[in-house]
Design a protein with these regions (language model features):
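Structural signal for interior beta-strand "rungs" in well-ordered beta-sheet cores
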Residues: 1-133
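Long, leucine- and charge-enriched amphipathic alpha-helices
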Residues: 138-142
């Protein structure tokens, strides 16, 4: 895995693209496992944080400034865009994606292959694209 590389932060200049400074760090708390081929970008102006007792499967990408809570389980090929925040006890199935600057609450379950494009409150189970309440998703996709 790669931990602490520069995040993907650019803005256009007249003649080229300017890299936005990435001066934060990565903080990995106790009893956390990170799978093979995963990347965790350091923060831009704040830090990227992985909470304690969190398990990250293989090939996960965590962008700059992401904050993952405690006791989370995240399956392979999940991607987090910059500055997203996950609460505690979040479970995410494989190949799900979380757009940037979102807040995922505590005790949330996100089904595999889901695309999260808006905030998710505490104690929700979602899946699909766009991610929606699992009961609605199953009713609409029988």
């Amino acid at each position: 895995c790669v931990v602490g590389k520069k995040g993907f932060g650019f803005f256009p200049d007249k003649n080229s693209n300017f890299r936005y400074p990435q001066i934060g760090v990565v903080i990995i708390n106790d009893n956390t496992e990170i799978g093979c081929g995963s990347t965790i970008d350091r923060g831009s102006l704040s830090n990227t944080i992985i909470g304690k007792n969190t398990y990250l499967d293989n090939q996960i990408h965590i962008a700059h400034n992401v904050k993952i809570g405690e006791n989370c389980i995240i399956a392979g090929q999940v991607g987090f865009a910059g500055s997203s925040t996950l609460g505690d006890n979040v479970m995410i199935g494989g190949q799900a994606g979380v757009s940037g600057h979102l807040k995922i609450g505590n005790n949330v379950q996100i089904g595999g292959g889901s695309g999260v494009i808006k905030n998710i409150p505490d104690n929700c189970r979602v899946m699909g694209y766009p991610a929606q309440n699992i009961k609605n998703f199953l009713r609409e996709n029988k």
